[in-house]
Regions:
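Sec-dependent N-terminal signal peptides
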Residues: 4-14
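Long, structured stretches of catalytic cores involved in phosphate-ester chemistry, encompassing
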Residues: 1
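Primarily auto-inhibitory N-terminal propeptides
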Residues: 18-194
Length: 194
């Protein structure tokens, strides 16, 4: 029995340490149980890409790490003049993590990366539901920004100390059953560079 247990522990350890590798040496795409969003009542799973969407302090992030970004832009929703968002180059490791304030992996579809930004959309079931939205926004430490074009729709933005990322929080809002729609804000169409 002891030999069986030892064998089981060793095999389990080896299996956990293995990474799935394609014949040409690349890592197989990862699909995580946590990487999904809701669309029209259907759970849509996402396949991870090889880049990251980050929010960083432009004044403090090292120049070496800034050169690893494909895109670097300011965002009015960040409210801090030194904060910017950026997209890392494929398979890049940002070493100055202390000054990266928000990170989200990319996802891929047919060779094109797309990203979940730091924001998500929520549609109220009724205009009287605004206090419910405000309460949940406070609970998850996200900021509400009113979308003027569509009634009952609100854009919410993850603050830097938010309890999680925009994908996870959008899912939690939807799964609460308190809102008609809650879905992440995607940014995409960036072709992978090999």
């Amino acid at each position: 029995m002891k030999r069986f247990m030892l064998f089981f522990v060793l095999c389990s350890t080896l299996l956990m340490a293995c990474e799935p590798i394609t014949p040409n040496g690349d890592q197989y795409p990862v699909v995580s149980a946590d990487d999904y969003y809701w669309y029209n009542g259907e759970k849509i799973y996402l396949e991870r890409g090889n880049q990251e969407y980050i929010i960083y302090d432009d004044a403090l992030l090292s120049e070496m790490d800034k050169q690893k970004l494909e895109i670097s832009e300011s965002d009015s929703y960040l409210e801090e003049p030194n904060l910017k968002w950026g997209i890392t180059k494929p398979n890049t490791v940002i070493t100055d993590l202390e000054h990266v304030l928000y990170r989200m992996p990319s996802y891929t579809s047919e060779g094109t990366n797309f990203f979940v930004t730091h924001s998500f959309l929520v549609k109220l079931k009724d205009s009287d539901d605004l206090p419910i939205l405000q309460n949940m926004a406070e609970q998850y430490n996200v900021k509400i920004v009113k979308e003027e074009l569509f009634p009952l729709w609100y854009l919410l933005v993850c603050n830097l100390p938010s309890s999680s990322n925009a994908l996870d929080i959008a899912n939690r809002f939807y799964e609460s059953g308190k809102f008609a729609v809650s879905e992440p804000n995607f940014m995409g169409g960036l072709v992978l560079h090999n």
